[in-house]
């Protein structure tokens, strides 16, 4: 179901800037939300203090920081993008999740180690996001939870024993990651077995496993199963990579306008799903190159004369769907995006939302059982609704580069992961 805000509430409209020629720009992208919030969890559960460098400051990461502070964790801002995290006994408290999936799914297992009840709530949309899998998993591990959706209260009473837990994570890989991040603190560790349909967004689970190992935790992996041994999570220094998924709309600007966009400090080795944009843009006709720069690399993308459509299974990279769908709506040939039925449970039902908004601008988008079919069409201006979804908002901005008169409702919803997005975008377009 697409979340529709109260019609009595007037949301601001942003005139998406139209590109008048090829866009050429060199950009630095803020840190990864996914890595920042995982680092915050691991630092809070560690045995010694940690330092986190190049922290992303956004609504989602601020919600995570505030949630951990409400549980008694000391987080000191040494600089705007540098935190010192001092772990300690977790206490009873109240956590505001907003619309952040990482907060509502990563913090309940952490709350199992608090010395009293922890209450969770969030935005209205958050109350309909899937939560049963993670909450049932906690119950099977001996943790008391009083509801199946937000709002709910977690109350463990004493350190849970742990053990084997079966979970259907076909709706979100965050269910697995949430359990894995806290698993070393359970007395006997935790074995997580996924028993549902195809598991989406595997790179995010790989990110979680990689970071746990970097913090000294032993994990054994097999198909749909993770065995996390009990042990001390080591405090350490975490340096956060740029958020590659947040880079994708800017790279799309090169693809749409035939220009060249360079993203600074692109990691040569990463678990971020956003790295897949390199191969996607190549398949759609772009020139893509990693350029050595000092001790690292920049990513350079130059757009084609005519953008080609793409047929792609996006089950592991679902968060890129709004960017790719926007590109597909502007492409010269048909696109088919599959493997993304789970996006119906994201900030909004992204499949229904993308279909509605593309078609309102004259596009031809058909919602499939597990994806989208997007055919070439001549688009026109109009209001693009964001549904309080940051990636829907950036998709509208992409289309606005090539279509006169596109207006994006509530562009500031991008502050969820990229505060000031619209200012950076306008400066890029010029």
From Swiss-Prot:
Family: Belongs to the EPSP synthase family.
Biological role stated in the UniProt entry: Catalyzes the transfer of the enolpyruvyl moiety of phosphoenolpyruvate (PEP) to the 5-hydroxyl of shikimate-3-phosphate (S3P) to produce enolpyruvyl shikimate-3-phosphate and inorganic phosphate.
Ranges annotated as spanning the membrane: none
GO cellular component: cytoplasm
NCBIfam families named in the record: aroA (TIGR01356)
InterPro entries to which the protein is assigned, alphabetical: Enolpyruvate_Tfrase_dom (IPR001986), Enolpyruvate_Tfrase_sf (IPR036968), EPSP_synthase (IPR006264), EPSP_synthase_CS (IPR023193), RNA3'P_cycl/enolpyr_Trfase_a/b (IPR013792)
Single GO MF annotation: 3-phosphoshikimate 1-carboxyvinyltransferase activity
Residues forming the catalytic site: 319 (proton acceptor)
Subcellular location: Cytoplasm
Domain of life: Bacteria
Pathway assigned in UniProt: Metabolic intermediate biosynthesis; chorismate biosynthesis; chorismate from D-erythrose 4-phosphate and phosphoenolpyruvate: step 6/7
Gene it is expressed from: aroA
Pfam families assigned to the protein according to its UniProt record, in alphabetical order: EPSP_synthase
Highest classification ranks of the organism: Bacteria, Bacillati, Actinomycetota, Actinomycetes, Mycobacteriales
Annotated 3-phosphoshikimate binding sites: 33-34, 38, 172-174, 201, 319, 346
Binding site for phosphoenolpyruvate: 33, 101, 129, 174, 350, 391, 416
Name of the protein: 3-phosphoshikimate 1-carboxyvinyltransferase
Entry keyword set: Amino-acid biosynthesis, Aromatic amino acid biosynthesis, Cytoplasm, Transferase
Keyword Ubl conjugation attributed: no
Any one of the GO BP annotations: aromatic amino acid family biosynthetic process
Catalytic activity: 3-phosphoshikimate + phosphoenolpyruvate = 5-O-(1-carboxyvinyl)-3-phosphoshikimate + phosphate
Primary localization class, coarse: cytoplasm
């Amino acid at each position: 179901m697409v979340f529709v805000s109260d019609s009595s509430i007037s949301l601001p409209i942003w005139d998406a800037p139209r590109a008048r020629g090829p866009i050429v720009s060199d950009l630095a992208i803020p840190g990864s939300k996914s890595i920042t919030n995982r680092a915050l969890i691991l630092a809070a559960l560690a045995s010694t203090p940690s330092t986190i460098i190049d922290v992303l400051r956004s609504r989602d990461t601020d919600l995570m920081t505030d949630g951990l502070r409400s549980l008694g964790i000391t987080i000191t801002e040494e600089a705007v993008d540098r935190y010192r995290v001092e772990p300690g006994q977790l206490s009873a408290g109240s956590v505001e999740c907003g619309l952040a999936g990482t907060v509502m799914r990563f913090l309940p297992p952490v709350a199992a180690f608090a010395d009293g009840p922890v209450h969770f709530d969030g935005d209205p949309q958050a109350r309909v996001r899937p939560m049963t899998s993670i909450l049932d998993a906690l119950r099977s591990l001996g943790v008391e939870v009083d509801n199946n959706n937000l709002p709910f209260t977690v109350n463990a009473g004493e350190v849970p024993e742990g053990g084997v837990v079966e979970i259907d994570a076909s709706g979100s890989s965050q269910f697995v990651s949430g359990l894995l991040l806290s698993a070393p603190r359970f007395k006997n560790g935790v074995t997580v077995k996924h028993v549902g349909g195809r598991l989406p967004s595997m790179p995010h689970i790989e990110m979680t496993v990689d970071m746990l190992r970097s913090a000294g935790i032993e994990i054994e992996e097999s198909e749909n199963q993770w065995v996390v041994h009990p042990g001390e999570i080591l405090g350490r220094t975490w340096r956060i990579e740029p958020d590659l998924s947040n880079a994708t709309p800017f790279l799309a600007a090169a693809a749409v306008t035939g220009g060249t966009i360079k993203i600074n400090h692109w990691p040569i080795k990463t678990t971020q799903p956003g790295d897949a944009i390199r191969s996607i843009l190549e398949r759609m006709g772009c020139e893509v190159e990693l350029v050595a720069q000092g001790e690292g690399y920049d990513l350079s993308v130059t757009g084609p004369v005519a953008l080609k459509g793409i047929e792609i299974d996006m089950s592991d990279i679902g968060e890129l769907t709004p960017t790719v769908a926007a590109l597909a709506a502007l492409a010269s040939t048909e696109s088919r995006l599959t493997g993304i039925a789970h996006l119906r449970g994201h900030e909004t039902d992204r499949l229904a939302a993308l279909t509605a908004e593309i078609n309102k601008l004259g596009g031809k988008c058909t919602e499939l059982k597990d994806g989208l079919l997007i055919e070439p069409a001549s688009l026109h201006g109009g209001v693009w609704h964001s549904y309080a979804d940051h990636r829907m908002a950036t998709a509208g901005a992409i289309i606005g580069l090539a279509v006169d008169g596109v207006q994006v409702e509530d562009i500031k919803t991008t502050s969820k992961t990229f505060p000031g997005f619209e200012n950076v975008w306008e400066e890029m377009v010029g």
